[in-house]
């Protein structure tokens, strides 16, 4: 029962409780329950492989709700391009999307970086009340940094 992985998860649960971070608490609790109920490796692999896409889908649904309810319309879209903040937001959205795409690919080819990214994200969630949306984008930033290092060499 108290394997290294379970102790690691319990540590993250404790950190989530200390930081009062419900997202981290729920995520760790779900993973602990999956382990306690002996969910097989294939199911865990599927969740690991598809979980980010599921999360992105849920976030996208939440973002689209104001459009569906009429809170945001075409006028708002047009008005957003009349300000510097609107253009900066557009550029930031494009940049983050590209970084996330590169990050997913980089995490697949360099699993070593994944451990550091996950730990860094957990630390940011606990210490700075960050949001755990960072690993994919962080991997994209790491990818770009590694490309720069390779270019300089």
From Swiss-Prot:
The keyword ATP-binding does not apply. GO terms for cellular component: plasma membrane. Pfam families: DUF441. InterPro entries: UPF0756_TM. The chain crosses the membrane at residues 6-26, 54-74, 80-100, 117-137. It comes from the Bacteria. Its main location: membrane. Keywords: Cell membrane, Membrane, Transmembrane, Transmembrane helix. It is found in: Cell membrane. It is a multi-pass membrane protein. Belongs to the UPF0756 family. This is UPF0756 membrane protein LMHCC_1001.
């Amino acid at each position: 029962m108290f394997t290294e992985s379970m102790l690691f998860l319990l540590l993250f649960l404790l950190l989530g409780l200390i930081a009062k971070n419900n997202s981290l608490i729920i995520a760790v609790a779900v993973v602990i329950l999956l382990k306690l109920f002996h969910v097989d490796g294939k199911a865990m692999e599927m969740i690991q492989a598809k979980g980010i896409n599921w999360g992105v889908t849920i976030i996208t649904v939440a973002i689209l709700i104001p459009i569906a309810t009429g809170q945001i319309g075409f006028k708002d879209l047009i008005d957003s391009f009349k300000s510097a903040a609107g253009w900066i937001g557009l550029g930031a959205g494009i940049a983050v999307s590209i970084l996330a795409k590169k990050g997913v690919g980089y995490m697949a080819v360099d699993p070593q970086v994944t451990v550091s990214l996950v730990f860094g994200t957990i630390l940011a969630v606990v210490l700075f009340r960050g949001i755990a949306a960072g690993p994919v984008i962080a991997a994209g930033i790491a990818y770009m940094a590694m490309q720069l290092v390779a270019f300089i060499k």
